[in-house]
Amino acid sequence: MKQNYCPKTIEPYVQSIWKKKNTFKVTENSNKEKFYCLAMIPYPSGKLHMGHVRNYTISDVIARYQRMLGKNVLHPMGWDAFGLPAENAAIKNNTHPAQWTYENIKYMKQQLISLGLSYDWDREITTCKPEYYQWEQWFFIELYKKNLVYKKKSWVNWCEYDKTVLANEQVINELCWRCNNKVIKKKIFQWFIKITKYAEELLNDLDNLPEWPEKVKTMQHNWIGRNHGIKIKLKLANQHTILNDVFISKPSTLMGATFITLSPSHELSFKIARKKHKIQEFIENCSSNTNTYNDINNTNIGINTNEFALHPITKKKLPIWITNYVLSDYDTNSILCVPAHNQHDLNFAIKYNLKIKAVILNLDGTEPKIKNTAMTSMGKLFNSNQYNNLNYQEGSYRIIQDLENNHIGKKITYYRLRDWSISRQRYWGAPIPMAVLENKKNVPIPKQYLPIILPETIPFKNIKPLSNNILLKKIYIDEKIAICESDTFDTFLESSWYYARFTCNNFHKGMISQKLANYWLPVDQYIGGIEHAVMHLIYFRFVHKLLRDLGLVYSNEPVKKLLCQGMVLSDAFYYFDHNKQKQWISAKSITIKYDSNHKIQSHFYSNNKKIFHAGMIKMSKSKFNGIEPEDIIKKYGTDTIRLFIMFAAPVESALEWKESGVKGIHKFLKKLWVLSYNHIKLYNHKIKLRINLFTEQQQHIYSELHKTIKIVSQYITDTQSFNVAISKIMKFSNTLMSISLKNEQNQALMQESLLAVIQMLYPFIPHFSFAIWEFLSPKKENIDFISWPKYNFKAILSKLKYTIIIQINGKKRHKILALKNSSQEKILEIILNENKIKKYLNNKPIQKIIYIPNKILNLVI
């Protein structure tokens, strides 16, 4: 063992052993408790960023810890490899997206290996390979057979920049989630999977996920959005036409309805538009709008049709408006609006000066004064004719009863969740395994043709969607010519089932091996960002239920425990150019100025520019505040990064990147290395720990050792407070640095303490721990197969030795160390032979002995 810590030599050495021995390969073992640890796999964009490093370090720490607990751990890695970035890069660089993707995978895989991550690389998955997506195509056909898939022309979110459809979950503030460009509405044919069939189950089963973050469950609950209400038939004024299925969410407020809103695609909207040019123009303009009825803060606009419907009870005329915020394909594409008691409706009514009528009293019985805020309390009904003075629930019941008795209304439950649009109009994705016959009928492609493989010989100078690629167009089905579907799958479909394929990635007889999948599933620990709460994390719960209903998996949910790690932040800086436009600038390009408290100044001058400090914000390429993991590894080593990431903040919180903190961690590792080196050089393994010979200091350290093992175990297992666990290990390690190694029992205590410290640090800093363990362990074992240390209850719950105060005639004269609960005779045997006590006794007879065990012995002479 070398005297100084040198990660540049240690880490490659340890990694080479792991590779040679295939240390982390795992197979099914019914004699061991299984543990499946999985982090969301990356898109092979080119390089890992610090967010990746944090995510995968967390999962690796958990996986290594669970192995030390004796569990059979599956910890796989793969690549979510289809998608627009590869296609756009291919266009830009005149290359094939496959080539770009596989080159990135090769580079990023080496980066992951350099981080010391304990993956079973034999289970690696790449989702753009036919051997993966062929089973996705098979799966889609099975869903089609079960009537869970359909194609229809519908309004979709369209990204003009990327020329493709976006799911509702992929539109954020009317912008594309990926490219941040404006999203418009467009009507095209799309394939859908009926996720709405599972809406109730997806919602209810959130209650069966006690180890998921409440925030994620709340986000999913709101996204699925279960609502109750009634649908009503209304007569149009001066016409015999019936307006069907007009929705109101709170029946008790029906008497306060003052107008009706329709979606632009409502049948009546089109009928009116045929006669009125301005309305036709308005409907066309709405196609570029992505507002929804749930977007309270968005700009909602409407147009008066000058048509009226009759209130179902009062028969008063209600004006009909067409608006941009009623969803086109929603169950509620016509709404009976009650502005006094609904904020959406109130905002619209105020904007267009529509009537506002309150019909529910405040809880104190007073009439509400409606200005800018709707009244939503559940008081008594008033201003409601025959329903006056009924309480809220009774009023709702009576109104529903009257509507149903008159056959003009019925109770319904609907969901905000929409069916999943899985068609994408791009090349780099899995082809949808459907075709169109000459009679326009959609048919699944026969299984013998699967997989439908992307044409790879096309020139990529002018890459186009599959609809423009003649190599994929024609196929014969039952001797009939069929035109292949030109759309590809939404890449969220690939990422919705890799967790299951990891359990059996070399299984060739089907999508999933039931035997292997049901040994490993559900995933015990899943790690990923909370930004996936209403996209990936809903989709893969849904797909798991589909797999269950196909008989491929047994559990109802794919994951037991979810951890959403926080973002990684770093300092960002900007200046204003001559056009007064904000320009972000890298910290490497400026000289940062600090104030008297060593904090970065809010603004300062560098290179003749006034530089502003934006504070700690999320690392990103656009802000030039990213930190390259490779640079930090070269400077400090992988283990330093790993330990800093796990120590600097709770895993679910944002982590502020500070190189001063990295330096502090590196300094700690160097000190611990030197301490271990000095001990190993002196220690003779024949020296045994003899607790009965401990001094008070040794006893204290021994007790602290076992307290540390206990509390670190609790922090990791119970609350995943890894940062607190590390701080406890560091605190105890610093205690060890004060021990003199000249005393044999000190050496024995140091040996036992260092063994435990290195074991506890192993999940965090595996290279460092591996290298020291080779020399520290008496049997020269491999730490990769060592168990987590166990603590001694006796050492924690009670002291092994106590200080006994010796008094003579009530005055303190001496103190000794004695084992707990030592007898009076034993204490006397010790002290009566000591010269100090003999001097005070001066040969006088002892008249009385007062002994309080573990505290005081008083001799009365």
Curated annotation (Swiss-Prot):
It catalyses: tRNA(Leu) + L-leucine + ATP = L-leucyl-tRNA(Leu) + AMP + diphosphate. It comes from the Bacteria. A motif ('HIGH' region) lies at residues 42-52. Its EC number is 6.1.1.4. Keywords: Aminoacyl-tRNA synthetase, ATP-binding, Cytoplasm, Ligase, Nucleotide-binding, Protein biosynthesis. The keyword Nuclease does not apply. ATP binds at residue 621. The keyword Transferase does not apply. PANTHER family: LEUCINE--TRNA LIGASE, MITOCHONDRIAL, LEUCYL-TRNA SYNTHETASE. This is Leucine--tRNA ligase. The gene is leuS.
